[in-house]
Amino acid sequence: MVMLTVAFISFMLFQYVGDPVTNLLGQDATPEQRTQLRADLGLDASFPVQFVRFVGNAVQGEFGLSLRQGRKVSALIAERFPATLELSLSAAVIALVVGIPLGVYAALRRGSFGSQLMMTVSLLGVSLPTFLIGILLILIFAVTFKVLPSFGRGETVNLGSWSTGFLTLDGWKHLVLPAVTLSVFQLALIMRLVRAEMLEVLRADYIKFARARGLPNRAVYFGHALKNTLVPVITITGLQLGSLIAFAIITETVFQWPGMGLLFIQAVQFADIPVMAAYLCLIALIFVLINLAVDLLYFAVDPRLRLEKPAGGH
């Protein structure tokens, strides 16, 4: 139902983004040429007919032909998806690996200069727009110091139908700046969340009991407090992974990263309705699957949910 609703709304909105026939033929085309091309593309049918046709094809994994490139939309997305997924996963790993330790430090050293500095920097991280962060990183590392490339994906290796830059040094170099740019907001968010949850957990009675038993601070902090702190972090991180994939558009545009986001921007400029609709449907599907995975993981991590019995149970 969610997918059908997203498909309907996106398909309806995209009817008003522009006329692909004008983009294909130009302003000097005759009315007869416009009518013929509109019929060839199936745009002469009514909206309900076009939508039903789109849904029927989408169920089979086909989204029609790109009006701009004349190729199957499914093939275009299959080419671009690996780049977006690698960028999003890299950004998520950076956000987790850096954000969680910094959040724990900020909680355990609350009031210290280092903690206050981290909170100030994290506030900038959630406030600055992504494109500005990307431009600043390009200015520093690509223009001034010339140590990292500023655009493109670099050299890739084909593993069947999947292309990856993880297996080449050039691919890693090209990945650094866009991945860091995309991770900044998530990193700051995770750090602030971990700090807030850690401070709340440290005030819990079972933490006081653990200290009263004489457990060392390391066991209290990392064996008890951090474990319970990570439960809500898992939920937020899972949901944010979907956001990383969806909102990688800006980062991919700044760095000309050949992913789905850049494909979507190019489709908007050309009023390529099949590509735009397919992109939004795929993003919606990713969100649905991630939400399902997060719910299952949350159930596996939090023992309280496994111990709960249904009402009326014995």
What do the predicted segments below correspond to?
Residues 44-100:
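An internal, D/E-rich "acidic patch" concept
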Residues 4, 81-114, 143, 158-314:
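Alpha-helical transmembrane segments of integral membrane proteins
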Residues 9-17, 45, 56, 121-152, ...:
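Membrane-water interface segments at the C-terminal ends of transmembrane alpha-helices
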Residues 23, 46, 76, 115, ...:
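Alpha-helical transmembrane segments and their helix-entry boundary regions
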Residues 2-52, 145-167:
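Hydrophobic alpha-helical transmembrane segments of membrane transport/permease proteins
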Residues 27-42, 119-133, 177-183, 219-236:
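Hydrophobic alpha-helical transmembrane segments
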Residues 30-62, 207, 256-267:
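Short hydrophobic, aromatic-rich alpha-helical segments embedded in or entering the lipid bilayer
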Residues 46, 50, 54, 72, ...:
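Amphipathic alpha-helical recognition patches that constitute DNA-binding helices
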